[in-house]
Amino acid sequence: MKKNVLTSAAMLVLVFITAGCGTMRKTEVNNVIYLIGDGMGLGAVSSLILSENSATGFEQDPVIGLSETCSANNYVTDSPAGGTALATGTRTNNGYLGVDPEGRQLTSILRKAQDMGKKTGIVVNTTLTEATPAAFYAGVTSRKKTFDIAKQFTESGVDVAVGAGLDHFINRPDSLDLTATLIEKGYDVYLSWEKVLNTDSDKFVGILPLADVHRSKSDNETAGAAEGQEVCLAAQLAASAEDTDATRLSEPTVYLEKASAKALDVLSRDNKDGFILMIESAIIDGYGHNNDQEGMVEEMQEFDRTLRQLIAYINEHPKTLLVVTADHETGGTGINYTGYESGKPSLIFSTKGHTGTLVPVFAYGAGAEAFSGIMKNTDIPEKIEELIR
């Protein structure tokens, strides 16, 4: 009799648990901030954490996972294929951008968000036509088709975008002025940083000089790349001579955090349907290609300032998810034995190209628990889509 009573009680508890699970609602996610560190592996994150005296944004209680970064045809992805995986949830061949291995157009998470009535935005410290941002709106079989990519940008439907690359929009072989096209489509177009900062427009594109979006290091080294890999713009920027070393060291770059804050302000205005904002720090990759320890740490410091600002935003907006990851790792970066006495970790690099090592995933805010464990790069946009539907 006692055994029967216990069995009945256990079954009753099971019924209640099952019923409860059946009525559980998924976390409500209205807004998504997608922060991508191009080339940012665990070595880059470690270099930041060990260099700082106070807690970084990476240490502010995120849900942590790891992501495989393979492309469709190689263990080591390039930026076009890596960006495509993070944007569309589909792996493609190296060199391909926004299309599958057969060259068919893919639909990015930004496009899907637009179909749901959400606003969308892009902020990058490189050109708007570079591989990662382009993966969210374009479809081409080569990243070198920058004029085609710029033309596709005019059809992207994003509400706000800030980056560089004006030549791709106006100094074109087809003689088109794509800034005029954007204006015809209802955008305000700004070509200076001051105008971007001071605008109250609800729909704008800022196409700025490269010097405004990135203060780069002065040296004469040529960016290196592994055999078979083309030298990316980020590596060229990281090795260019736009500013002196003294300028770079004395004036921390604030572009990414200020441009991100501006985009958040625009996307949040009178917006009940939510938004997705993609932000990329592209130059981490460049310093990895150049095996430049000092530059990598400084770029990670800018990334962290932006990250901490975004964490503050989601803490004030509880229906917002922040996902931080990388398209791949660059440089084979690790922490060396030397440097402890000086309080500055010494980095060691194993390559001047990309590697196929797993990259970190940090998630904060609403729905963050979905991003724990080991996952594929394609899982990340799929998880985001599931949470916002």
Predicted regions and their residues:
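Bacterial N-terminal signal peptides that target proteins for export
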Residues: 1-9
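Bacterial N-terminal signal peptides
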Residues: 9-17
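N-terminal catalytic scaffold of extracellular/periplasmic and nuclease hydrolases
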Residues: 22-172, 176-198, 202-203, 304, ...
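Structural motif
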Residues: 34, 161-162, 206-208, 276-280, ...
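Active-site His/acidic residue clusters
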Residues: 131-136, 212-222, 229-247, 260-264, ...
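Phosphate/oxyanion-binding active-site loops and adjacent basic polyanion-contact surfaces
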Residues: 142, 252-260, 299-303, 380
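Functional cores that coordinate and move charged inorganic groups
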Residues: 154-159, 166, 170-249, 253, ...
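Active-site proximal loops enriched in glycine and acidic residues that flank catalytic Cys/His/Asp
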Residues: 279-283, 288, 300, 324-337, ...
